[in-house]
Amino acid sequence: MLQTLYDYFWWERLWLPVNLTWADLEDKDGRVYAKASDLYITLPLALLFLVIRYFFELYVATPLAALLNVKEKTRLRAPPNATLEHFYQTSGKQPKQVEVDLLSRQSGLSGRQVERWFRRRRNQDRPSLLKKFREASWRFTYYLIAFVAGMAVTVDKPWFYDLRKVWEGYPIQSIIPSQYWYYMIELSFYWSLLFSIASDVKRKDFKEQIIHHVATIILLCFSWFANYVRAGTLIMALHDASDYLLESAKMFNYAGWKNTCNNLFIVFAIVFIITRLVIMPFWILHCTMIYPLELYPAFFGYYFFNFMMAVLQMLHIFWAYFILRMAHKFITGKLIEDERSDREETESSEGEETAAGAGAKSRLLANGHPILNNNHPKND
């Protein structure tokens, strides 16, 4: 049965146009073609990325944070309380008023003390400013290098300027070492993002992040299997064009450089809209949906690839909505902070802030300006 499933999975009609077989893509006459076995290396490379990231954050990002004067906020810790901790872990982090009253009776604390405990406990679980800065530094470094590498791999190719050449001779298109390594490194990086997502800074579009990472990995794997390598390299280079701008804006945001952060955000928003909402649908998607049909009848691989492209495009539209809304409020002077951000909760509104707490709050508010996230925009 397993052999039957294996044979069906690799059935040529799922992956290749009619009248073509895997034998047509065997290496010969010095020409090398993409193979599924090539991707085995991406998993150990993903683990290597995690190791490199650890040392980068420790020996590069942390000293850089100190140089830019990235300061932590002093957080008041919730005192140990077994009753409240059990509820926090099992029932929820934000109890309703009726639950606050019940917990007050069970713990012997006043309702106000219970609410204060949960605020402090939630703040304990929020990532520190240094953690956010180190994560943004790592992603900025990778995305900048990846964008430069992507341009180097694609800009001298004829299909960079004439998208019809993406399909010229398809699928009998050999690959060169630069394309191979560009694919392996990009796929390895996205594997590493998926592996570390549970420990990374969790934002409110966490589910969209997972969908994006999974869709990207599937697209990269499928495009390699089916030898959509020319289209794949263009898509990766286009995606990396805006990500490093976003991560650099976040770094300056955490460092308190408001003007630099805001200016970089505006540049990021412009580049994101141009690349994801203009070039992607009207050039790249047109290239992958229309041009292949001029050469071959539609086949499963054609539909599957373009379906996954449509999933990515929907995520682009989702994120662009928030970017444009933020940009509008930013321009009109109404934006105080990112509406979707996971804000630190303060106690000053209820008159509970001590002198030390007030000092900490003033440091927090100095960091209250807009920023989005990553390979796909998210919020801090």
Swiss-Prot record:
Ceramide synthase activity is inhibited by sphingosine-1-phosphate. It is a multi-pass membrane protein. Keywords: Acetylation, Endoplasmic reticulum, Glycoprotein, Lipid biosynthesis, Lipid metabolism, Membrane, Phosphoprotein, Transferase, Transmembrane, Transmembrane helix. Disruption phenotype: Most mice do not survive beyond 16 months. Ceramide and downstream sphingolipids are devoid of very long (C22-C24) acyl chains. Total glycerophospholipid and cholesterol levels are unaltered, while a marked increase in C18:1 and C18:2 fatty acids in phosphatidylethanolamine, concomitant with a reduction in C18:0 and C20:4 fatty acids are observed. Membranes display higher membrane fluidity and show morphological changes. Mutant mice show signs of neurodegeneration characterized by the loss of myelin sheath structure stability and formation of numerous small cysts in the cerebellum. The modification Phosphoserine is found at residues 341, 348-349. GO terms for biological process: ceramide biosynthetic process; negative regulation of axon regeneration; negative regulation of Schwann cell migration; negative regulation of Schwann cell proliferation involved in axon regeneration; regulation of lipid metabolic process; response to immobilization stress; sphingolipid biosynthetic process. Glycans are attached at residue 19. Gene3D superfamilies: Homeodomain-like. This is Ceramide synthase 2.
